């Protein structure tokens, strides 16, 4: 099972905009996902099911870091990433970033959470 990913489009906590991404194995195609989604819609009504879509994420040049600790402490890790970007004459391509969660946040102590932080650079 692949870890789930969140693509954050806003960095302001009070106005979070994000997309949840669940990577699929290579043998799972769009037809299979759409068929499973239709079966799910018939069993259980949920308006959010209309927002589910299948897509691909293109490869990109990124900077990433393994953050260990509470989500609220991520700004320290982002500062380290920004220093690295500056030291290597790169620039951040956009304000959004990805977070890949390696632990279950409901079962892991906050100070032991592991999250890969990633953003695009140019």
Model-derived segments and their meaning:
Residues 13-17, 60, 112:
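Short connector loops at helix/strand junctions that flank enzyme active sites
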Residues 33-73:
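A mid-sequence, solvent-exposed acidic-amphipathic segment
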Residues 2-7:
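Short, small-residue-biased leader/transition segments that mark boundaries at the very start
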Residues 22, 116-122:
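A short, hydrophobic, proline-anchored segment that marks a local hinge/packing element in signaling
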Residues 8, 113-115:
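Aromatic/basic-lined ligand-recognition segments
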Residues 11-32:
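Extracellular-facing segments of soluble proteins and assemblies that are Gly/Ser/Thr-biased and enriched
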Residues 38-42, 71-93:
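Long, well-ordered alpha-helical scaffolding segments within enzyme catalytic domains
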Residues 95-113:
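Beta-rich nucleic-acid/ligand-interaction surfaces
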């Amino acid at each position: 099972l692949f870890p789930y990913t969140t693509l954050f489009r806003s960095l302001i906590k009070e106005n979070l905009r994000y997309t949840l991404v669940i990577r699929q194995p290579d043998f799972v195609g769009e037809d299979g996902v759409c068929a499973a989604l239709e079966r799910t819609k018939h069993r259980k009504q949920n308006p959010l099911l209309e927002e589910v879509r299948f897509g691909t994420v293109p490869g990109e040049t990124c900077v990433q870091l393994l953050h260990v600790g509470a989500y609220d402490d991520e700004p320290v890790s982002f500062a380290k990433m920004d220093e690295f970007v500056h030291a290597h004459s790169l620039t951040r391509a956009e304000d959004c970033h990805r977070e890949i969660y390696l632990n279950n946040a409901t079962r892991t102590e906050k100070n032991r959470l592991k999250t890969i932080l990633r953003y695009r650079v140019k």
